[in-house]
Amino acid sequence: MNRLMILVFAAVILALASADEDVDITKRGVPCLCVSDGPRPRGNNLSGIMWMKTGGYGGNGCPKGWHFCGKSRGFFSDCCKR
């Protein structure tokens, strides 16, 4: 059972690592709250996308063409907007 869990975990990590940048991440990403979304009385729109910090991206964790839009930086991820 432990070997199966390790194999599945490794497959997920490899799939994430080999994800193509050209894929439209806005359709498959996790939404997050940008500063520009602001507090609204009827709820907030989540216009940002959560990006995992990896070595290939800049210091802010966002890929090319995206900018950091969150209130504070996360330890493993940042909220980015196109």
Curated annotation (Swiss-Prot):
It is found in: Secreted; Nematocyst. One of its GO terms (molecular function) is sodium channel regulator activity. It comes from the Eukaryota. The keyword Metal-binding does not apply. GO terms for cellular component: extracellular region; nematocyst. Keywords: Cleavage on pair of basic residues, Disulfide bond, Ion channel impairing toxin, Nematocyst, Neurotoxin, Secreted, Signal, Toxin, Voltage-gated sodium channel impairing toxin. It holds the Pfam family Toxin_4. InterPro entries: Myo_ane_neurotoxin_sf. Its main location: secreted. Residues 20-26 form a propeptide. Residues 1-19 form the signal peptide. Disulfide bonds join 32-79, 34-69, 62-80. Gene3D superfamilies: Anthopleurin-A. Binds specifically to voltage-gated sodium channels (Nav), thereby delaying their inactivation during signal transduction. Causes death to crabs. Belongs to the sea anemone sodium channel inhibitory toxin family. Type I subfamily. This is Delta-actitoxin-Aeq2b 3.
